[in-house]
Amino acid sequence: MRLLIRFRDVNSLIKYLREELDKLSVTKRRLEEVLGMDAVVDIVELKDDNIGITRVRTTELKWLLNEIDTRIEAISVILEELRGRLGGVNYTGLVLLELEDGIPRRVLLSQPLSLG
C-alpha cells in the first residue's frame, strides 16, 4: 500500500524523518537487548478494532530487527539525498513523502519551488 504524507517545507520533513530515525534506533537497541535474553514477550496487535495478544519467544523476533534495519536504511538514504541535492536550503511548497508498506521510498517536491 502506498501513502503520501504532506509537509509544509523540506525542514519539517527532515525534522519528521530524524524523529522517526531516533525512535527506530531506540527500538532497535532495546530489541537487541531483549533478543539476547531468550525470554518470552507478549505482542499486542490492533487490527480492525480488534485486539490480539500473542506470546512468542524473543528469538522468533529477528525478523522484526530486519524490518527496523530496512526502515532505518531507507530514512538514512532519503536524508542523505536531501542533504546532497538541497544542501541546507529550505524549499517551501508541496513536499510529499511517499511511503510504500510503511517504508519511506521517495520525496516529491512541487514545481516551481520558492525559497523559504
Tell where the protein language model's regions lie, with residue ranges.
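Short, charge/polar-rich alpha-helical segments
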Residues: M1-V34
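Amphipathic alpha-helical coiled-coil segments and their boundaries
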Residues: L3, V10, L17, K47-N50, ...
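Surface-exposed beta-strand edges and flanking loops
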Residues: F7, L99, L109-Q111
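Short, surface-exposed, low-complexity cationic segments
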Residues: N11, L108-G116
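Metal/cofactor-centered catalytic core regions of large enzymes
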Residues: D22, V44, I51
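Coiled-coil heptad-register positions
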Residues: S25-K28, E32-L35, A39-D42, L46, ...
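Coiled-coil termination/hinge junctions
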Residues: T58-R105
